[in-house]
Regions:
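A short acidic, Gly/Pro-enriched loop at the edge of an enzyme's catalytic core
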Residues: 33-45
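Short, glycine-/aromatic-enriched active-site segment of Class I SAM-dependent methyltransferases
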Residues: 46, 79-96, 148-168
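A short SAM/SAH-binding and catalytic strip from SAM-dependent methyltransferases
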Residues: 43-57
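Short conserved AdoMet
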Residues: 20, 55, 69
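Conserved class I S-adenosyl-L-methionine
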Residues: 73-117, 121, 133, 137-138
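C-terminal lobe and adjacent flexible extensions of AdoMet/dcAdoMet transferase-like proteins
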Residues: 145-206
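Class I SAM-dependent methyltransferase SAM/SAH-binding core
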Residues: 1-35
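A short glycine-rich, Lys/Arg-flanked "PGG" loop and its adjoining helix->strand segment in the class I
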Residues: 58-73
């Protein structure tokens, strides 16, 4: 087998270093719309936490579909738009989003990374562990911000804080939005995970 990894950013080099012991892994510093892989050549595809950071997510999904063989599975994760959350939760998110847009995402890379690490230490970690304690006590923690991180490592929190606050462009989608984009891209048999983080789904190229 052969694993083809594609990323337009320098993150591709980190992936390469992590997988360097595998001689069947190949790396392409390319965008999906200009990818050098042949069309309809791939047995499967996945995109986890990338396509919500680009301007035209619909087109990007179509570009992914072009590279897949008929019947190939495609695993996708996109930020969801908090469609099932209460008004207070959404208000808190909007306030943090303003901080991201107006301040943090505009900082130089090193300062940005430091600020996001501080956010992970002072906000992500305490709220996550508070949610864990409440869960142990038998309380429902679904509507507590960052409760999804209650069983995750600090490394994940730190990485996600940078991904969340360090990027200038972030899009969010409802389950219906994602379903429509996948169907418009030629996918069917779409199944969504009922577990957080939302939305993760598997579909197949028709």
């Amino acid at each position: 087998g052969r694993l083809n990894c594609i990323d337009p950013s320098s993150a591709i080099y980190l992936a390469e270093s992590k997988l360097k012991k595998y001689d069947n892994a190949f790396f392409y510093k390319e965008t999906v719309d200009a990818c050098s892989l042949e069309n309809e050549s791939q047995d499967f595809g996945y995109s986890l936490g990338v396509l919500h950071h680009i301007p035209d997510t619909q087109k990007a999904i179509k570009d992914c579909a072009i590279k897949l063989k008929k019947g190939a599975p495609f695993l996708l994760y996109l930020y969801y738009d908090f469609e099932d959350k209460p008004a207070l939760f959404k208000l808190i998110w909007k306030l943090t989003d303003l901080i991201r847009l107006k301040v943090i995402s505009k900082l130089p890379p090193r300062i940005k990374k430091t600020i996001c690490s501080i956010i992970a230490i002072t906000i992500y970690y305490p709220l996550a562990k508070f949610s864990r304690i409440l869960e142990i006590l038998g309380l429902n923690v679904e509507n507590i911000p960052l409760s999804d991180y209650r069983n995750k490592s600090f490394y994940i929190m730190s990485n996600d804080a940078l991904d969340r606050f360090g990027t200038k462009l972030e899009q969010r989608f409802s389950k219906k939005d994602i379903t429509n984009m996948l169907k418009n891209s030629g996918f069917h048999k779409i199944t969504f995970s009922n577990k957080t983080p939302y939305w993760t789904c598997i579909s197949y190229k028709a």
